[in-house]
Structures are given as C-alpha cells and as structure tokens.
C-alpha cells in the first residue's frame, strides 16, 4: 500500500448513533463552543508538559500531533463531550463506540476490528497532556484492548474554549453529589475552582494545595506505589503546568 494511503478515512467526523441522547444545556453550549475552534491548534497542546500516566514523569520522547492525529482529535473531542456525564465527569461511551461513531475504527479482510487510531490518540496524547484521565476496567472480554473509563479534566474544557468561570457557573446549578462514586473516580483531581485559587497563591502554598489534592485523589495503595519521590515529581509537574497555563492566559 502506498505510504500516502496508510491512513483509513483521512477526514473523520463524529456521527452519533440514531438513539438521540437528551443533552444538558451545558453539553449543548460546550459542543457549540468546540465547533467554533480548532482544538488541534490550541496553545495548550504546546504549553503543557506531557506526563507518563503510569510513572508521573515528564515524557522525554513524545509524539506531537501530525495531520492525521489532529484530524482524529477534531472528531473525538466533540464525541467525548456528547457522551459526557456532568455529575460523574465520565464519558459514558467506550473507546470502541467513540471510534465507531467518529470513523476511526477499521475492519480487516478477515473481519477483525481495529480501534488503534482512537485508542492511541487517547493513551498517547490526550491522557499524557492531561485532557483526560483513564481508569482500567476489570473485564473478562476476549478483545485485544483493555476497556477503560474516560474522565474529562478541567483542562479538557479549556481545550474546548470554555473558561473556568463558565463551567463553574454550570456546575453550581446542575451538579448533584453522587454518594456512590468511588474516591478515585471523583473527576480530575484539581477542579476549575481549585486551579483559580492555586494560581493566585505563592509557590509554597500552591504546592501544598496540589499535594493535598493528590492525596485526596489517589488511594492509599496508589500513594504507597508512587512514593515520596514520585509524589514530589507529580507536584513539580502539576505546578509547572499551572504556571504555564495561567502565564498564557494572562
């Protein structure tokens, strides 16, 4: 196959299934905002440090967006918004469903489905950049990929052109406490409100706030695995990202 044709579907786009979901005012607003901008050209794609989700270290080698991955990103971001649950911060669709409805899945001649284009975009770009957080699902599925829950972070909404004040406005009206949410599934660990507060603090106080947020986000066993050095590294990275973000916006 010629190199220029190695990508199937050069111009993917999100085409939701016919079962129309009832979308909240916030989701309608967010999807309108994201349709007006090019998420692949956001300054956040250059300003944020890519982080290895497993180790918390800055990735020394990181594949930035090429034109094909940028096209995939433009398709999958509105899809994630469409299936987003504002209460749980969860994208209520599997990676396979997102891939199918964005035209990012392929079938081989033998009938095997591949969702690599979508799954790699998430695991190799969106998650390291801090736009989403993923949690593996324990499953007995015989498929070739590990199913994951996808949570959208405050950074994701900044990517979509939604300001912290706007999302806080919607959250204060719509969000309801979910008692059954597991501790580690309570959204991304730093909220928009926290980010704004932390950005106005001196460095020592800001780092303390980030430390407390990390402790609340991870389980005791996860913190033990991370260790003191790993925790310090995570604080350094999050503080650096916060400084870069608000420096860009100021």
Curated annotation (Swiss-Prot):
Single biological process term from Gene Ontology: DNA replication
Superkingdom, taxonomy of origin: Bacteria
Keywords, in A-Z order: DNA replication, Plasmid, Plasmid copy control
Any single Pfam family the record assigns to this protein: IncFII_repA
InterPro entries membership: Plasmid_replication_init_RepA
Record bears the keyword Transit peptide: no
NCBIfam families, alphabetized: RepA_IncFII_LM (NF040977)
Family: Belongs to the IncFII RepA family.
Function of the molecule: This protein is essential for plasmid replication; it is involved in copy control functions.
Protein name, per record: Probable replication-associated protein repA2
Lineage, opening ranks: Bacteria, Pseudomonadati, Pseudomonadota, Gammaproteobacteria, Enterobacterales
Gene from which this protein is expressed: repA2
